[in-house]
From Swiss-Prot:
The keyword Cell cycle applies. This is UDP-N-acetylenolpyruvoylglucosamine reductase. Keywords: Cell cycle, Cell division, Cell shape, Cell wall biogenesis/degradation, Cytoplasm, FAD, Flavoprotein, NADP, Oxidoreductase, Peptidoglycan synthesis. The active site is at residues 160, 237, 333. Pathway: Cell wall biogenesis; peptidoglycan biosynthesis. PROSITE patterns: FAD_PCMH. It catalyses: UDP-N-acetyl-alpha-D-muramate + NADP(+) = UDP-N-acetyl-3-O-(1-carboxyvinyl)-alpha-D-glucosamine + NADPH + H(+).
Amino acid sequence: MNPSTNVDLTPFNTLALPGRAARYQKVTAPEALTAPELVKEKRFILGGGSNLVLTGDFDGLLLHMAIPGKRLVKEDAEAWFIEAGAGENWHDFVQWTLTRGWPGLENLSLIPGTVGAAPIQNIGAYGLEVADCLHSVTGWDFEKKALLTIDRDDCRFAYRDSLFKQQGWHLNGRIAITSVIFRLAKAWQPNMRYADIAQELATRKIAAPSAQDIATAVIAVRQRKLPDPAVTPNAGSFFHNPVVEAIQAEALADAYPTLPRYPQPDGRVKLAAGWLIEQAGWKGKALGPVGMYEKQALVLVNRGGATGQDVQRTMAAVQAAVREKFAVELTPEPIFL
């Protein structure tokens, strides 16, 4: 391994924040991770950089996962099992499965990032999470010096959470995900639980949608609501939808009857962070070069020339506004480096 030095990381994060890595290595094969000298390095594992806030320079080795490949591993009477390399673009992979007649991931169309990063955050949208379709994750464990396969049930998936985050492996670089296997059930049913998707399909006069129809609807809705990172730098949804106790949700609903709320299996209630931010006066508002997007208050955008410190200032201001108005704490989704 022969890493580059003092590498500009601006092109490698979708918020286009400045920062440099002391050492940078693009990884295109799992074997590259077995180099003995990597064990003692301070490491950070980078995917698509779409869930990352750079707060300055990184004084270690940044491993940029770019392992390619996608294939049908096996098929049985109930499902297809498809493997993809960690470096595969997530949206491109989803569309590839659909063109081959393997439905199941269509609601996750157009989410930025890579396949390898998807399980870490347990990405989700429009009524579907990666955990719903994931079979197993394979990754290199730098401590054990071994390639591990972690089954879905051992990944401890939760809302925007997983074993990889709970153990801090996404921060300390202990495990580098190299590939993911998905289980796509043959007994497919369209997932139209979200009103935006159902409305888009109705507008297109599609009563019995295919998986590709769902994907097309999701893409259309996302393109209308969310900024393209290539044009307006952003990291997608910036805050988790907060989950509160039922008694607090009821009190808030009494005061704000239009508050969107979603009962959870454990009896608590999930609230819509975007709605809270908008009602707190932050939709389309900025603090210096960083603000909340005018079409979707949940998305934080870099309006030009922002730094990680600018992002942190705006984040804190939004959190304070929501806390003051609703007594609800917002937690950021991205990783801070």
